[in-house]
Amino acid sequence: MFRLEEKIKEKLNNKSSSELKTLTFHALLDEWLEYHIKTSGFKVTTLDNLKTRIKNIKKNSSQNLLLNKIDTKYMQTFINELSNVYSANQVKRQLGHMKEAIKYAVKFYNYPNEHILNSVTLPKKSKTIEDIEKEEAKMYNYLEMEQVIQIRDFILNDNNMQYRARILVAGAVEVQALTGMRIGELLALQVKDVDLKNKTIAINGTIHRIKCNAGFGHKDTTKTAGSKRKIAINSRIANVLKKIMLENKKMQQWEPSYVDRGFIFTTCQGNPMQGSRINKRLSSAAESLNINKKVTTHTLRHTHISLLAEMNISLKAIMKRVGHRDEKTTIKVYTHVTEKMDRELEQKLEKLVY
């Protein structure tokens, strides 16, 4: 019995060795990707991003490159080349995927060079003053509430938009600024998630722009486990949501093509709105109002963090409300706002007359 098992094992090993000789790097990546999709249990959005990164790895490497011909020197050169095209974060992820693919080759093809990527290092680029300024502009990109109101009112009075679109986009702007939700979380919001009586919202998903059985737009789980949360809302937000729900009921009654899927921020067909459309309206309104910032839906999320910081809400409470697991981003915005408040206090003290 023992000898039979040994013979079977030897036969399988020989088969793996034979297949390994003709296995290309691209074929390995494709096989690993298919295996990973079936076994990882990752959400749709994560897997779509993964597919894109694998596609980019293949785009920048030879289709006929055999796995057996690859060595550490080649991979280091390849990583260096990728870093000239993609961000440091993207290259780090790409290298991670390649390491997983190599592990797959070891497991299923008896590939002998398991540690081929272990000594490959990610290139480090020195940041220019321009890079630092761009990072700071992105990190500290928030609005004053007066500016949010200006943008909201501009959209509400924009005659180039249909009445329903004005109500929904302006509502999305205001709700985001006063809740700190990610745009995907806002668009995934359903009537059942909103408790108008107790003024709470259950944030339990995000929208992925794919076609599904019910229509266009699939509600997936939140970005992280910590992103799933329940938050309090004020009367203003409750009224905005109530008004939008009423608009949706009108659509359901009078528009035959409207399918009620339970979402709040919807198109004329009942599907979740596109975040890109809201971003376009936001950017256009900000430009028309001479707000010299790159205003996006994420700006509104930072705006909420800054608003809470100005109200002296604790860092921990802010992180819980906006669903931040990593405190890095929250701290940067929080610190920037509190430093600004300190400067304003100093200026007021200077003006005191003794």
From Swiss-Prot:
This is Integrase. One of its GO terms (biological process) is DNA integration. It comes from the Viruses. Signal peptide: none annotated. Integrase is necessary for integration of the phage into the host genome by site-specific recombination. In conjunction with excisionase, integrase is also necessary for excision of the prophage from the host genome. It may bind the DNA. The active site is at residues 182, 298, 301, 324, 334. Keywords: DNA integration, DNA recombination, DNA-binding, Hydrolase, Transferase, Viral genome integration, Virus entry into host cell. GO terms for molecular function: DNA binding; hydrolase activity; transferase activity. It comes from Staphylococcus phage L54a. Pfam families: Phage_integrase. Belongs to the 'phage' integrase family.
